[in-house]
Structure formats: C-alpha cells, structure tokens
C-alpha cells in the first residue's frame, strides 16, 4: 500500500488531463500505483499531438509524412526554423516546445511526439552532460530540472539535404503502410555489439548472446547475423571490414 500525503487531488486530476496521452499508457501500466484516467473518449476528443521541427528547406519533402500522420488521426504541428517563434538554435526550439507544454490545458493537451528533421547543422542538438556526445533528450525535458526524463517521445530524421529526407520519408511510409515489394528481409536480424572496448565485451556481447540464446535463432525461423566484439564471430564488430559486412547484411 502506498499513501500520498497532502496531495492536491483537484490539481492532480487537472495535470492528468493536460499532460495525459493514451500513447503513454503502456509505460504507466508498469508502475505499481497505476490508475487509468477515467475518460474513455479522450483520444477522439483530443487527438494525440505530433510536433515536427525541421529546416524550412524540407517542408515540401515532409508533406507525404505529414499527410499520412494526419490521416492516422494525429494533430500534426509543423515548426520550421525560419519561423521567429521557433528559431534555429537549440535553446529557442526548446523554448518553443516548452511553451506548448507549459500552456497545455485540459481541452488543449501537451504534445506527445517530437520528430526533428535535419542533421545537427540544420537543427542543432544539445551536448550530453557526461561528454561531448550529442543528445536530443533535452529538447523534451521540461519539468524535472534536469531529471533526464523527457516529457515527450522524440526522434530524428538525420538528413543534410532534401534527397535524404525524401528517402527517409519514403522508407517510413513503406514500413507504416506495410507496402514492401518483398518481405523476406523481415526474417533476418543484424546484431552488433559496438566498438566500445570498455563496455562491448561484457554488455554488448552479453545482450547479443542472451538474445540469440532465447529469441533470435533458427528455432524462431530467423536468420541472424551476429557481430560480437573481440571474438566469437567470423567478423567481429571491431574489425575494419565490419562496417561493409554489416551494411551488406
């Protein structure tokens, strides 16, 4: 039994309505204190919002994806970096997103998804706290003061030009509409341990070995291409020829 002291029930229910999304339910159900929101019509009354932040050069190339997401029932919000309200810096884009989140209401809930379109030169990422690696997580961290828990699902189509966007949009639509000319590749899996000498031997190899022992194997009618680190496969992930072999597979 979990007891919450001095909780403001009215404020709690209001926050649920402002920030709730049916897309989060599969995560919430794993919590010990999960209580479903008692509004069965919420998905039809307030459809899920899907924000796309992109370089303005990609607007036309993105239209097929925007049309498809709209047909699926999402409310798609387009935000381009040439718009002064959006801006082209990571801070200005974060402020634009945070404003939507902070000003959410029960009748106009916060967005659920963020798709960034463009490479770092087109839509800059943030730098991680523990190194110089790039991270988009901070775009969706609004209310935790750096708690590393994003408030939205986020992803990126890393493209430097229109042609690259068109390819990624076409591939996304092919997957979502299931319009493959040949589906045999769906029975093949490529598993790569990585090239981190301090982690790959234990964690990378460990995850791959666990997966192939229990799930990804011929017993499940799957063809698996493994690239362990250091040893254990004909071509290991740290070999110079690994990149070409992985692409080929």
PLM feature spans:
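Cysteine-dependent hydrolase recognition
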Residues: 1-249
